[in-house]
A protein has these predicted regions:
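Outer-membrane beta-barrel signature, preferentially recognizing the C-terminal barrel domain
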Residues: 330-352, 356, 639, 643-650, ...
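Surface-exposed extracellular loop regions of Gram-negative outer-membrane beta-barrel proteins
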Residues: 315-320, 541-555, 598, 609-639, ...
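Short acidic/polar hinge/loop motifs at secondary-structure boundaries
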Residues: 135-136, 142-145, 173-204, 220-223, ...
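Signature of Gram-negative outer-membrane beta-barrel scaffolds
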Residues: 468, 494-666, 838, 845
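Short strand-turn segments of transmembrane beta-barrel domains in outer membranes
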Residues: 205-207, 216-254, 264-277, 568, ...
Length: 1006
């Protein structure tokens, strides 16, 4: 009996002890990677040793809680519609509930929500003024989802930044152009299905594939396994870009044997309803295969390209648009044999090959090794002429404003845009009649006269073409090698990093595309011939050929290179690292990189103007006739200016540091901040004064420094979505180079500026609010900023033919223009007020703004999404867009006649008589009128036996507003008055947005 009692007591004590064994759990919030927005309805599965021990579902705010877990290691899998599965290891210790803070999920192409980005399948390329996305990604963020696509037609720049500040990756390799820094949209345009799956970071946020900059980054996965499984076909037509797009894509998805493969092809053909001469004849293809091995290794091979051609649009002056009665006028085309022919056609074929090796032995570690090669050609045709009149129909001498009555030719023309018929001379009136007539008899005057160009060449006695069509080439060979790692150290911290190497060798040259009826084109410098006609050696574009072939200029036939030929060589190496800590509702990230960049020019032609060093020129002179002797050209430092061979190599150290701090609160509130400092090397295009002709690099070339910060508040709960951001960015020590014909020098010149500073500050606000009607929501976005120039850069102007420096000084009215106080004197005349020292009193300044983007952009709309129907109606407002400035107009030289001998501004209200009126006429920056637009879209999809049929229709600019300027520039030329007392501007040139336009897409998924 005692034994029985003892046994029962032991059992009861053991049971009590067992009941008291500590149990814990796991909690956190499931959020999207872009914007940290909550993901409701996500499914969580907790497993131990392959057996499911618990399940849960995230709430409306993304929160989840799994309890009653014994101490130990668990595997947690999270799945959600539209996102990639997430698998992590979780350790429960001492009965505590483990807080995972944020479980971030990456969007997946496998399941698509019905939203605007699916319906509006934008084609992204470098066409300049078409409807390309302004932010390369869209997301659930209430601001980015609108700004990413909805503002693209107006050329909106996110926070006023140029596109080169946004990092674009393909399969983990940064693809921004090595020469210019710009995002290479044209490499994958037309491959929408393949590039749909992407990962994004916004603003200063870092990523898993690089430390990034201050304008966000996008990584297009591109792997075959990321392409949506099944077959998709689509047919699209639109009225603003091209007539027809056909697209076919197939993805196998991951197969049982570990293989995945995908293929895609598309064609875009035809013109549009608005801009004559603009057309597409472009194609695209993608081939990809991927093998997943059983030990965590994956190997993928991808190849894609977008061969094709498209006709381009040209900007024109408002005078031309008004004469034609059409803001969509395009001066690039004319009729040839009854067919439209565009003189400016871009032809491209730049295939990209990617080999990627991924090693992920566990859920906590991943490494990726990627090799990417970009090659091919990119050509752009244009007219060239020699010893002949300018063939462009909108050339200023062909316009009525060139011939006023009772004035000397060239007098006051640019100041008189609003002339009447009676103001014109007889010649000007004939021009006016020719431009305004709608008779077919004047088509050859209003557009390119191809027949005249051919006839001029036919009548050439020796077969030499006076007119030809050139093709300017930028042919890249771009090699990239990348190694990235990601290591989850524990449940709340992740370390990532990598090494990137790039070598780019790009050939710049031009060749003859069409001799236009002639037999050859002479390879000489027409500008040099005007100045140095007595020395034939000096005008040669290829002096070595001239000497080797009996002192005869090279005759170029179709396909031959001429004019210039050089290589731009760029090397970039970068080491980056990032650390992310998520604990107790805090999220902390720090990242940074250090890098090295170098570049040099390598000339392939010896130009007679810059034949070489003193020793090289001495050797050449021994071969040249006595009447054609040359001299070495020396720069201001006594160094020889050369054209052939390697230039000096410039070396730069680069780097950045970034920090991110976030605090989440109950109820879906989050506050976060970013801070970043960047030191970037200038690009090749910003460094060389005239790479077409010589090896000279601009002086005082230094790194560009950027300081950026933002503060954010976000609320996301129960369908409500709000984000508010305040940002500030300072960019210092930028450089810029341009070349243009300077009438004051009667020569083609180069203009280099250094020390350009900018300041960008503003706010972003976005919201999405559900309305009482199921599926209906109110959405709004506001971007309000001030993007200004804050320095007066230093400029050096040189003659292109001689490298002679003709001007060097600051550009005193680049960043702002002083506004002076005035008073009325005893005679009732207005005068400038002076202080006690005799200086004019400044009452304020008129700022100059970063151009070609609205500083204020807003949208308010209704969105209805239910039962696979999608409808959206939105109104947009854009304001404070400004014209791109010509720095020459902001120099003291261009403002001559405005100041007295003491340097004080002369008060004058007549713009044609110098003084203050003329000063403000020369220095003011044009601001475009505010714009109001109305857009709508509708879409529907049906599921039939797991197959999908759908359509989408988008209509933009419903009010048919044809007066919307999207950009433009001041011409880089000056006109003298007949008295030579003052200079005048040339008329500015503009681009306009098309009127009402549509895009209709029908798609099938099997």
């Amino acid at each position: 009996m005692k034994k029985l009692v003892s046994i029962l007591s032991l059992i009861l004590v053991s049971a009590a002890l067992l009941a008291q064994t500590p149990t814990g759990g796991v909690t956190g919030a499931v959020v999207s990677r872009a914007g940290r927005l909550p993901i409701p309805g996500a499914n969580l599965i907790i497993q131990k040793d392959g057996q499911t021990v618990a399940t849960s579902t995230s709430a409306s705010d993304g929160r989840f809680l799994v309890e009653a877990l014994a101490d130990g290691m668990y595997q947690m899998t999270i799945t959600a519609d539209g996102y990639k599965d997430l698998r992590v290891n979780v350790t429960v210790d001492n009965g505590f509930v483990k807080d995972m803070i944020f479980m971030t999920m990456t969007p997946d192409v496998q399941v698509e929500s019905v939203d605007a980005s699916n319906f509006t399948e934008f084609d992204m390329d470098d066409s300049g003024y078409n409807d390309n996305p302004t932010i390369l990604f869209s997301s659930n963020d209430p601001y980015n989802s609108v700004a990413g696509y909805g503002f693209s037609s107006i050329r909106f720049k996110n926070r006023g930044y140029n596109s080169e500040t946004q990092d674009v990756y393909f399969s983990g390799v940064r693809l921004n152009d090595a020469i210019t820094g710009y995002s290479p949209y044209s490499l994958w345009t037309g491959l929408n299905e393949v590039t749909r799956s992407k990962e994004t970071s916004t603003g200063l946020e870092s990523s898993d594939y690089g430390s990034g900059g201050y304008n966000g980054s996008t990584n297009i996965f591109g792997n075959p396994s990321n392409v949506r499984k099944g077959l998709r076909a689509s047919v699209l037509t639109n009225s603003a870009m091209y007539r027809l797009r056909l697209m076919l894509t197939y993805g196998s998805g991951p197969l049982d044997n570990g293989w995945s493969y995908a293929v895609s092809a598309s064609a875009r053909v035809g013109g549009n309803d608005w801009i004559k001469g603009v057309y597409y004849r472009s194609f695209a293809y993608y081939l990809g295969a991927e093998k997943k091995f059983g030990d965590g290794k994956t190997l993928a091979l991808m190849h894609f390209a977008t061969p094709g051609q498209r006709g381009a649009q040209n900007a024109s002056t408002q005078e031309v648009y008004d004469l034609m009665g059409d803001n969509m006028y395009n001066s690039n085309w004319g009729y040839q044999n009854g067919k439209v022919r565009n003189s400016r056609v871009r032809k491209t074929f730049e295939p990209v090959t990617v080999l990627r090796y991924r090693y992920a032995p566990s859920a906590n570690f991943e490494s990726n090794t990627i090799f990417l090669w970009r090659t091919g050609f990119n050509g752009y045709t244009a007219l060239d002429w020699y010893d002949a009149s300018d063939p462009r129909p909108d050339y200023y001498r062909n316009l009525p404003s060139y011939s006023f009555a009772n004035s000397t030719e060239g007098d006051d023309q640019s100041a008189r845009y609003d002339y009447s018929y009676d103001d014109l001379s007889k010649k000007g009136q004939l021009m006016y009649e020719a431009w305004t007539s709608r008779s077919s008899d004047y088509l050859m005057y209003q557009h390119l006269n191809w027949d005249r160009l051919y006839n001029v060449n036919y009548n050439s006695a020796d077969g030499r073409s006076k007119y030809a069509q050139e093709q300017r080439h930028v042919d890249q060979n771009d090699l990239n090698l990348v190694e990235n790692i990601k290591w989850r150290i524990n449940d709340y911290s992740v370390l990532s990093g990598g090494v990137n190497f790039k070598y780019n060798r790009t050939e710049y040259y031009k060749k003859i595309a069409d001799l236009l009826g002639g037999e050859y084109f002479l390879n000489v410098d027409s500008f040099a011939e005007r100045d140095f006609a007595i020395n034939e050696a000096k005008i040669q574009n290829d002096l070595d050929y001239y000497i080797a072939n009996g002192f005869k200029s090279e005759k170029i036939t179709k396909g031959g290179k001429y004019g210039y030929d050089y290589f731009a060589n760029v090397i970039k190496a970068n080491l980056w690292a990032g650390y992310n800590l998520q604990k107790d509702n805090w999220d902390i990230k720090v990242s940074g990189n250090v890098g090295y960049e170098s570049f040099w020019r390598e000339g392939m032609m010896r130009k007679g103007l810059f034949a070489g060093t003193e020793g090289e020129v001495a050797e050449l002179n021994r071969k040249l006739p006595a009447t054609q002797q040359l001299k070495a050209v020396l720069d201001a430092d006594g160094n020889a200016v050369t054209s052939k061979g390697k230039s000096e190599t410039k070396h730069f150290l680069t780097g950045s540091a970034k920090a991110y701090l976030s605090r989440s609160f109950k109820g879906g509130h989050r506050v976060y901040a970013n801070l970043g400092v960047f030191s970037d090397a200038p690009t090749f295009n910003e460094a060389f004064i005239s790479p077409r002709t010589r090896n000279t690099i601009i002086g005082n070339l230094r790194n560009k420094f950027t300081y950026s910060a933002d503060l954010n508040y976000q609320y996301s709960n129960k369908g409500y979505n709000v984000r508010f951001t305040a940002f500030y960015t300072k960019i210092k020590n930028q450089s810029d180079v341009m070349s243009f014909y300077d009438d004051s020098q009667n020569s083609f010149t180069n203009f280099a500026m250094t020390g350009i500073d900018q300041q960008h500050l503003g706010i972003e606000f976005g919201f999405s609010v559900p309305l009482p009607v199921t599926g209906l929501s109110l959405e709004g976005v506001l971007s309000a900023g001030e993007y200004t120039y804050t320095s007066n850069p230093y400029m050096v102007q040189t003659i292109d033919n001689s490298a002679e420096v003709v001007r060097q000084s600051t550009v005193p009215y680049w960043s702002k223009v002083p506004l002076y106080a005035t008073y009325e004197d005893a005679a009732g005349m207005t005068q400038f007020d002076m202080d006690g020292d005799g200086n004019m009193i400044v009452k304020g300044y008129k700022k100059h703004y970063v151009p070609s983007t609205p500083q204020i952009a807003a949208q308010l709309g209704l969105k209805y999404n239910i039962n696979y129907w999608f409808l959206e109606l939105n109104a947009q407002c854009f304001a404070k867009s400004h014209l791109d400035m010509n720095p020459l107009y902001r120099t003291d030289f261009a403002c001559k006649g405005c100041f007295d001998e003491n340097g004080n501004l002369i008060y004058n209200e007549d713009v044609n008589k110098g003084g203050s009126a003329h000063f403000y006429y020369m220095t003011d920056q044009e601001e475009f009128k505010p714009v109001f637009l109305l857009n709508a879209s509708v879409g529907k999809s049906w599921y039939i036996n797991n197959n999908q049929l759908g359509f989408s229709l988008q209509v933009n600019n419903i009010t048919n507003n044809r007066g919307v300027k999207t950009g433009g520039y001041e011409q880089t030329r000056l006109q003298n008055s007949s008295s030579k007392d003052v200079y005048y501007r040339f008329q500015s040139k503009y681009f306009y947005m098309s009127g009402i336009n549509y895009m209709l897409n029908v798609y099938f998924r099997f």
